[in-house]
């Protein structure tokens, strides 16, 4: 596992898991699903692709 990925997982656990758990406990599944989808689209995906392109680009230079 990449060190950047591990750092991101720790950051995600500390900052987002409490709100995600509270959404699940209130049985608000639509908001929970929206929270997960928006987080993947706007935070995790751009971050992961930028790290991936950086690691791939550094191998060819």
Curated annotation (Swiss-Prot):
Q: What is its main location?
A: membrane
CC annotations in GO: membrane
Compartments annotated for it: namely:
Membrane
- Alphabetical keyword list: Membrane, Transmembrane, Transmembrane helix
**Which ranges does the record mark as transmembrane?**
5-25, 29-49
Q: How does it sit in the membrane?
A: Multi-pass membrane protein
Q: What else is known?
A: Completely overlaps YPR170W-B.
Q: What is this protein called?
A: Putative uncharacterized protein YPR170W-A
What species was this sequence derived from?
Answer: Saccharomyces cerevisiae (strain ATCC 204508 / S288c) (Baker's yeast)
């Amino acid at each position: 596992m990449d060190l950047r990925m591990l750092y991101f997982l720790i950051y995600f656990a500390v900052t987002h898991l409490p709100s995600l758990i509270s959404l699940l406990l209130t049985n608000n599944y639509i908001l929970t699903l929206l929270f997960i989808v928006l987080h993947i689209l706007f935070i995790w995906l751009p971050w992961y692709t930028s790290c991936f392109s950086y690691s791939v680009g550094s191998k060819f230079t």
